């Protein structure tokens, strides 16, 4: 991508747990900082929709599907819906088999960054050491897209973000 990205509609895919979403906030901010006028949407799991809607760099948050493999008509409806949104670029931040399958559903005509063999912008594979930090992989993926990852993200909005709903009656918070 050049200094002025040609992408007007960008979809980020992040289906992991809450910690994965929090850890990827700097990457989401980098996309917004690089393309401030673009519509940036997120595809994520249902439990995190409410929280993700408070992320100031996102325009829309869409729920990811959890259909069974044999529910072909539902998968096709999902694919039709996502294709109708006409994204210029999809950035697969998850790079798991499920999101690689999404690439086939969305159609190969959309610019895609991720791990699918058909990607225009391949995400680097894990190198030695194998336990490479996920943010380092995102940093390399963003470099391939021409998106600077060195702008600090303002996270003050987190102090006012609503809790993840519904919280179970009993839960544990681990802070490292």
How would you describe each model-predicted region?
Residues 1-176:
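Catalytic machinery of carbohydrate-active enzymes
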């Amino acid at each position: 991508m050049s200094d002025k990205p040609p992408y007007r509609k960008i979809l980020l895919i992040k289906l992991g747990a809450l910690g994965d979403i929090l850890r990827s906030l700097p990457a989401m901010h980098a996309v917004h900082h690089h393309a401030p006028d673009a519509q940036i949407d997120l595809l994520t799991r249902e439990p995190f929709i409410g929280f993700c809607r408070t992320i100031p760099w996102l325009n829309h948050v869409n729920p990811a599907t959890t259909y069974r493999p044999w529910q072909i008509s539902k998968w096709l409806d999902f694919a039709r819906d996502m294709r109708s949104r006409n994204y210029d670029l999809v950035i697969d931040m998850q790079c798991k088999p499920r999101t690689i399958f999404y690439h086939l559903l969305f159609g190969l005509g959309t610019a895609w960054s991720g791990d699918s063999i058909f990607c225009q912008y391949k995400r680097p594979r894990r190198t030695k050491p194998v336990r490479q930090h996920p943010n380092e992989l995102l940093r390399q993926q963003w470099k391939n897209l021409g998106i600077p990852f060195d702008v600090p993200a303002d996270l003050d909005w987190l102090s006012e973000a609503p809790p993840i709903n519904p919280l179970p009656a009993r839960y544990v918070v681990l802070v490292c």
